Amino acid sequence: MALNAQQIDFRSAIRQRDYRLMVSIPNKPAPKEGHPVVYLIDGNLHFGIAVDTMRIQACWPDTRDAVIVGIGYPTDRVADALTLRMDDLTTPLQESLANTPWYRKMPPPPNGYGKMDDYLRMLDEEIKPRVAEVVSVDVGDQTLMGHSLGGLTTLHALFRRTASFQHFVAIAPSIWFNNREVLDHEASFVERVRAGEVRARALISVGELESTLRYPSVGADKLPASKDDFQQMVDYCRMVPNTQELGSRLAAEQRPGFTVQTVVHMGDDHNMVPPAGIARGIRFALRSE
């Protein structure tokens, strides 16, 4: 556990399962409005990186120190956390994806798919109040950050639960899931932006090498079984083009109250990009204007 951190285990009434919160609190008195908060999806994987990054960046006067809340599961095994997250960070599986040749050969997650909306409701209704019980928080300075399916969930929240956060950091978001279903909500979101109803800042990033991945020579048991299937997966996911295209469309809608940045992290692939994405995301969300 990182310095100045505490662990909160609880059972969600909404999701009817157990969760673990990892909460890192700044080692300084809270300002009168409370500390900013970064809610980090996949806390089992990325909490330590985020806390260390926050500690370093907060040394500079132009970056606000913040509470880091890693949302995870009561396990110390990364493999378990990766399995448990699948239903939390997805919408119900559509036939268009289920029948895709490369995806059909993937082992199905034991808990299925489709609980993303419940997960985000749990975050608002169960996690935020628990955090507020242990530290003074600024309800007007809150960030949602996630990688991969966590990035997809972050985009879903941006489009559908915009008022829940002020900053959204989507790192290598899995826009491809369910034939890019998340983009079905883009048009209505843009309408609200144009009407002046949205106040949000979004950072969308991706690793430069995510669309040119090569089939690994070892440790590919959780990937498509052949090089051909793997290449079909890479082509289907379009990680870099999907991110850049969405970023460009949203950037064209920028106006007072709504800001978007898109970043390509040079030399990084999907598994390498979280540290760079988290560092850039903390800087984006917490840099003093």
Model-flagged regions — what are they?
Residues M1-E289:
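Non-catalytic cap/lid and distal C-terminal segments of serine-dependent acyl enzymes
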